[in-house]
Amino acid sequence: MVEVGSRFDLRTGRSPDAPETAGFEGNEATFGWMHSYETGSTVDGPGVRIMVFMSGCLLRCLYCHNPDTWHLKDGVRIELAHAIRRLGDFAPALRAMGGGLTISGGEPLVQLAFTRGLFGAAKRLGLHTALDTSGFLGHRADDDYLADVDLVLLDIKSGDPDTFHKATGQDLQPTLRFAERLNALSKPVWVRFVLVPGLTDDPVNIEKVARFVAPMKNVEWVEVLPFHQMGVFKWQTLGLEYQLSNTPTPTDAQVSAALEIFRGAGCRAR
């Protein structure tokens, strides 16, 4: 039995008629549920980008800074045609700045048809495209879907199955299988690893991620992202138990040590 206030309480923050994220399809090809968007991103792909944050996610990461994206109707219903028109308004500036569109979440692959349509439109507008994903639902993205994705920002949260499950509530293998498939497709990838003291910072855990990633020729970068507390107020607002309230941000020395493990395994890391 899931307790109210648990990160697995699917009722928290949802509209009463919200569909389950796991099985929602509906008219996804014509509308979707968007949490928000922002312009001016310079860290989520090359150039200056527009970031679209979709609603819906099946992971329940202990350090999630956007728990308000977990459920579809926590976002705003938006017509795909309207989203494409808005993207078109930004396209000339994005092209001029060598940027493009990055779709994040939540988990974009929950809303497969909507994000497929948005990526396709971005390519027709001459924009670079990036998918920011945990890879947990990577099996849903067929090769045609990935053909419209220029770069995958793949969040590998742990190399150890038990640590991964503790951090996310889900299994590690789907993410690893998706990573292997992206490598087979020679799809450019930036691996992202969140360094959380006391959770993911064990050198053995980092080494497992590094050894898995190092042989993959498609991985352009491994990015070590320091844990932060910036999303804790959202957990509090939603009435969710936040288990990492006493977890510090990693020191520069801890980040450097993690980077050295990745570099020592042969990864390009930053």
Question: Where are these predicted regions, by residue range?
Answer:
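Structural preference for long, well-ordered alpha-helical segments within the folded cores
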Residues: R60-Y63, F114-G117, A121, I261
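Short, conserved loop/turn and helix-capping segments at secondary-structure boundaries
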Residues: R77, G169-L172, T249-D252
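Conserved AdoMet/S-adenosylmethionine-binding subsite of the radical SAM
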Residues: G88-G100, G105, L109-Q236
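Auxiliary Fe-S-binding modules of radical SAM enzymes
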Residues: M1-S41, P197-R270
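N-terminal [4Fe-4S]-dependent radical SAM core
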Residues: M1-F53, L59-V76, D89-M97
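Short cysteine/histidine-rich metal-coordination sites, predominantly Zn2+-binding motifs
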Residues: G75-R85
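Short glycine-enriched, charge-decorated loop/helix-capping segments at active-site entrances
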Residues: D68-L72, H165-D171, G239-T247
